[in-house]
From Swiss-Prot:
PROSITE patterns attached to this UniProt entry: ZF_CW
Region (RNA binding): 503-594
Encoding gene (name): Morc3
Organism of origin: Mus musculus
Record's subunit section: Homodimer. The sumoylated form interacts with PML (via SUMO-interacting motif). Interacts with TP53.
Positions in coiled-coil regions: 696-874
Protein name: MORC family CW-type zinc finger protein 3
Length: 942
């Protein structure tokens, strides 16, 4: 029956089976261990160290977790053993990891069936018992947690509750007496701390799920036994097709990366875990910035290469300084092409929500967008580093195989737990490192705060030149794609017909719009855009044409619908250097009233505009018309007596001739580019006077656009002239260098092209394309020959300079090496001196402490002697002889126990002292103590 409060409304019951059900959220055992580590890390406990060990108690293998944090009161321990109580808050910038008040229950019950918690906070000491075995034995219907509380003098508080809880603990736990419980409390060093003991560990094939034998300083997950392949390493479920990193099966490796910036030391089986600043222990470190739309701030992403193992790569995703997902592959790393190998990314996703086992994030839209953005950022970093490093190391090794070292070396002080940056070249560090060992005098004191990090969250630390060059390369290679994709375009995608309403013609008119940009070569013209017009989709006062870009000129004409295979453009059929981008817009039918005026005026205006800009347009009718459209469309158009728009289209050739004259000193002749397009005819019966204003407005816009294009063409001409002058200056300098370095060679041969060029220029004849091509090839050959001569001269010059400077360089190098050795020895001596100073200081402190203890013991011995003598004197004068004897015996017993303690203390100071041969009933120990005190006083005075 569930408990009933005074109001009579029942409380919800919690079945003991829920302890096991709740623990199944941890499919990976190390995630349960991490929950217990998080409890010691959180700011309410704020432990500096946590010890994780394996021990045996009453023939049971146990896991122990001991920390030196703030401990807990009995009430706080009760909330910890209950469900959903979490009052953790941020303290001094330390953000808690725990969110749900469920970590200890799920983690401890995942590792074993029974757990005991020992804690003390300086005032009280408490013992709590959470056990599935105990609840099964007593057949409990609710979760029951016995808790015993002691005061500083080891006396129980709240006797009624504590006695019942103590009886349950002594009967059903590994500790059968109260003294054993107090001994575990004494195992907590210091006045505050917590100790957790877990037993009845989860088993797998008649053994625990942990391997304690392979590495005596680690806790590992054993290898899987495969019947066909033998033993194979453990892998997490999501990494079955990948190389498993060591953190998947080694608790020591997992704890080293568990926190983005560790604030606590973790000691596993007696050996400290070498925690690392994950974002600082990479090579070729660069930072990028992620600007999500669902956040008002930016997020920093750190990229770098793994220096230890290139097969361990991916994104390390942290939440509030705690690792959630490790080595998550994104972007190009998901492809089987060895891209992104060795690249590690670090991001702190405080804006995402982790699952309650803290091993994944909720699969929300924000998470998907973040993963997508991480993939793009990683691709940028990979492409940039691949180009940069392959240029720096021109060898056959890819960038992921180049030997790398971390960009920076950081170490954590064992006293203040602050992170300090070390200079380059320090490889070996002592087992315990303190701020006083820092070569940098600015950070040689534990009181000095940590070195500030780069807080620029707006700009990346590297320029993405690869992306810029890729865009530029695509822009340059754009003309190469047009001839290849133009024959493959399905005409049904370009020319689609639609059925209109009864009051409109069943036709959509398409208008091809070839945009002629500036001609970058005298042998080719370039098509930029091909659009389908939408006459009815825009207001009447606006132009039917799309706004032109700054770099293009326009040539538009009205066409009728083509319903059969597309017209092939022979001028681009064999051109491999050009490109076209086809943009298709759906158009809606419109009454044909406006079409005649608009089409006629557009053709005329474009002809006049092109004549002004130097472009000649000739309309040449094709001898063969295009294939007729379907009879259905034709008959439908004829059924309307008021409006008739024919769907039959002819294919006249529209020849565009553009001639540009370049300056004579450039050596470039006039080139002719011919472009054939689809001509159009629009037959209409009525015209509208209202469309004249709209057409004039269109003409005005076209004139302004043509003026802009003409101005830009003139600008490009001026730039071309400037670049030509620069090329001539460079060629002149190159010739002067050749004249200085080699003897002049006279060539009595003349080239035929020069003569032909002069003859044609005199006669006013234009050169053919073949002549221009041959001249261009000869110019290229001449440039290559000059380049080879220049490189040969440079090589000769460099060899001469190397031969003269080799001896001097060798001497300078030897001196530099010697000087470097001297500085290294000096640094080493300085470090050793500081270490010795620290050891001397520690020894002096220990010596003074021992001296004070000796003095206290000596005074106590003297007091006991005086009381003993006084008691003996009083006993001799008393009438009854038996009572003083017993009193003296009690004093002598205290004196003997005190001498035993003094003897143990003296054995630590005097190693040669054999306590087994010492008689504690006489004053031998007192004399030895006096001698040691005299020697210590003499040493301190000297």
């Amino acid at each position: 029956m569930a408990a009933q409060p005074p109001t009579g409304i029942r409380l919800s019951a919690l079945c003991p089976k829920f302890l096991h059900t709740n623990s199944t959220s941890h499919t990976w055992p190390f995630s349960a261990v991490a929950e217990l580590i998080d409890n010691a890390y959180d700011p309410d406990v704020n432990a500096k160290q946590i010890w994780i060990d394996k021990t045996v108690i009453s023939d049971h293998i146990c896991l122990t977790f001991t920390d030196n944090g703030n401990g807990m009161t009995a009430d706080k321990l009760h909330k910890m053993l209950s469900f959903g109580f979490s009052d953790k808050v941020t303290m001094n910038g330390h953000v808690p990891v725990g969110l749900y008040g469920n970590g200890f229950k799920s983690g401890s019950m995942r590792l074993g069936k029974d757990a005991m918690v020992f804690t003390k906070n300086g005032e009280t000491m408490s013992v709590g018992f959470l056990s599935q075995t105990y609840l099964e034995v007593i057949k409990a219907e609710h979760v029951v947690v016995p808790i015993v509380t002691f005061n500083k003098h080891r006396q129980m508080i709240n006797l009624t509750e504590s006695k019942a809880s103590l009886a349950a603990i002594l009967e059903h736990s590994l500790f059968s007496t109260e003294q054993k419980l107090l001994a575990e409390l004494n195992a907590i060093m210091g006045k505050k701390g917590t100790r957790i003991i877990i037993w009845n560990l989860r088993s797998y094939k008649n053994a625990t799920e942990f391997d304690f034998e392979k590495d005596k300083y680690d806790i590992r997950i054993p290898e899987d036994l495969d019947e066909t392949a033998g033993r194979k390493g453990y892998k997490k479920q999501e990494r079955m097709d990948q190389i498993a990193p060591e953190s998947d099966y080694s608790l020591r490796a997992y704890c080293s990366i568990l926190y983005l910036k560790p604030r606590m030391q973790i000691i596993i089986r007696g050996q400290k875990v070498k925690t690392q600043l994950v974002s600082k222990s990479l090579a070729y470190i660069e930072r990028d910035v992620y600007r999500p739309k669902f956040l008002t701030r930016t997020v920093r992403i750190t990229f770098g290469f793994n220096c230890r193992n290139k097969d361990h790569y991916g994104i390390m995703m942290y939440h509030k300084n705690r690792l959630i997902k490790a080595y998550e592959k994104v972007g190009c790393q998901l492809k089987a092409n060895n891209m992104g190998v060795g690249v590690v990314g670090i991001i702190e996703c405080n804006f995402l929500k982790p699952t309650h086992n803290k091993q994944d994030f909720d699969y929300t839209n924000e998470y998907r967008l973040t993963i997508l953005a991480l993939g793009e950022k990683l691709n940028d970093y990979w492409n940039e580093m691949k180009v940069k490093k392959n240029a720096e190391y021109p060898v056959n090794l890819p960038v992921e195989d180049i030997q790398k070292r971390p960009d920076q070396t950081w170490v954590q002080c064992d006293a203040c737990l602050k992170w300090r940056k070390l200079p380059d070249g320090i490889d070996q560090l002592p087992e315990k490192w303190y701020c006083s060992n820092n070569p940098d005098p600015q950070f040689r004191n534990c009181e000095v705060p940590e070195e500030p990090e780069d807080e620029d969250l707006v700009h990346p630390t590297y320029e993405k030149t690869y992306k810029k060059t890729s865009k530029e390369r695509f822009r340059i290679r754009q003309p190469e794609i047009l001839p290849r994709i133009l024959p493959q375009i399905n005409p049904e995608l370009l020319y689609q017909t639609s059925v209109s309403s009864q009051s409109f013609s069943p036709v959509k008119e398409s208008v091809p719009r070839p945009h002629l940009s500036e001609v970058t070569s005298p042998f080719a013209a370039r098509i930029i855009n091909l659009n389908l017009a939408s006459p009815a989709s825009e207001p009447e006062n606006s132009s039917m044409k799309r706004k032109l870009g700054v770099h293009s000129s326009i040539l538009n004409a009205k066409t009728r619908r083509l319903s059969n295979p597309p017209v092939e453009n022979s001028s681009y059929k064999n051109d491999d250097d050009e490109d076209v981008i086809i943009l298709e817009e759906n158009s809606t039918p419109k009454p044909a009233v406006d079409l005649e005026v608009k089409s006629d005026i557009e053709v005329k205006s474009e002809q006049s505009h092109t004549e002004q800009s130097g472009i000649h347009v000739d309309l040449v009718s094709s001898p063969k018309p295009c294939v007729q459209a379907s009879s259905t469309s034709t008959s439908t158009s004829r059924s309307d007596p008021g409006i008739t728009v024919s769907t039959q289209t002819d294919a006249p050739g529209l020849t565009v001739k553009k001639e540009e004259s370049m300056e004579e000193d450039m050596g470039v002749r006039n080139g002719t580019a011919t472009l054939s397009c689809v001509g159009t005819e629009a037959k209409v019966q009525e015209t509208s006077a209202e469309s004249v204003d709209a057409t004039s407005h269109q003409l005005q816009e076209l004139r302004s656009e043509l003026l802009v294009v003409t101005q830009e063409r003139d600008d490009y001409k001026r730039q071309c002239q400037m670049f030509t002058d620069q090329i001539q200056v460079l060629q002149q300098r190159l010739l002067e260098m050749n004249d200085k370095c080699v003897k002049k060679e006279k060539c009595h041969q003349s080239t035929e092209t020069d003569a032909v060029f002069l003859l044609d220029s005199v006669n006013g004849q234009a050169e053919s394309l073949d002549h221009l091509g041959s001249q261009y090839q000869q110019a290229l050959q001449e440039i290559e020959r000059l380049k080879r001569q220049c490189s040969a001269l440079q090589q000769v010059k460099s060899e001469c300079s190397q031969a003269s400077c080799t001896e001097s360089k060798s001497e300078v190098d030897e001196m530099a090496v010697q000087l470097d050795d001297v500085f290294r020895q000096l640094d080493k001596c300085t470090i050793e001196r500081d270490q010795y100073k620290n050891e001397v200081q520690l020894l002096e402190i220990e010596k003074s402490h021992i001296h004070s203890q000796c003095e206290e013991l000596q005074t106590e011995v003297e007091q006991l002697k005086s009381t003993g003598q006084q008691a003996a004197a009083d006993g001799s004068t008393a009438s009854n002889a038996e009572e003083p004897v017993s009193y003296v015996d009690g004093e002598s017993l205290k004196l003997r126990s005190l001498r035993v303690n003094v003897g143990q203390l003296l054995a630590m100071i005097v190693p040669d002292l054999d306590l087994q041969q010492v008689n504690y009933d006489v004053d031998v120990v007192d004399e030895i103590l006096g001698q040691v005190v005299e020697q210590m006083s003499e040493i301190s005075s000297t």
